[in-house]
């Protein structure tokens, strides 16, 4: 059979639903089958542009910024607060990016959830040691 979400992704979604605010903002990749957006209804910085293009909506700048924040620690820190980020979700799609900043995030932010290839970092000031 076809599996859209792994067991770890489902566990991460359950954690998000039970432990984050409904209006929490997550930095993730913009894949159309995004775990955070699809399974939890939480907001992400930039979702899939698959349909937006045909409606004339300009999403490319936000899409580029989201990818740069996932791959460049300086860009991440320069935009983290102004974008209003609460969490960073690193899963299979995010790890496929060249240069994803997982080491930087692990060194600077607490891990709120981890299972297999899924890691969620908490960016709240009271969570940061």
Language-model segments: what does each one mean?
Residues 1-129:
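Extracytoplasmic
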């Amino acid at each position: 059979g076809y599996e859209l979400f792994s067991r770890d992704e489902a566990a991460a979604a359950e954690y998000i639903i039970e432990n984050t605010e409904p209006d929490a903002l997550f930095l993730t990749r913009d894949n159309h089958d995004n775990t955070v957006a699809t399974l939890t209804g939480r907001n992400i910085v930039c979702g899939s542009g698959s349909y937006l293009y045909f409606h004339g909506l300009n999403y490319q700048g936000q899409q580029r910024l989201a990818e740069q924040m996932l791959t460049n620690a300086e860009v991440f820190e320069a935009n983290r607060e102004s974008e209003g980020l609460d969490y960073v979700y690193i899963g299979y799609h995010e790890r496929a990016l060249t240069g994803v900043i997982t080491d930087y995030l692990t060194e600077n932010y607490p891990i709120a959830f981890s299972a297999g290839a899924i890691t969620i970092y908490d960016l709240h000031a009271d969570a940061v040691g």
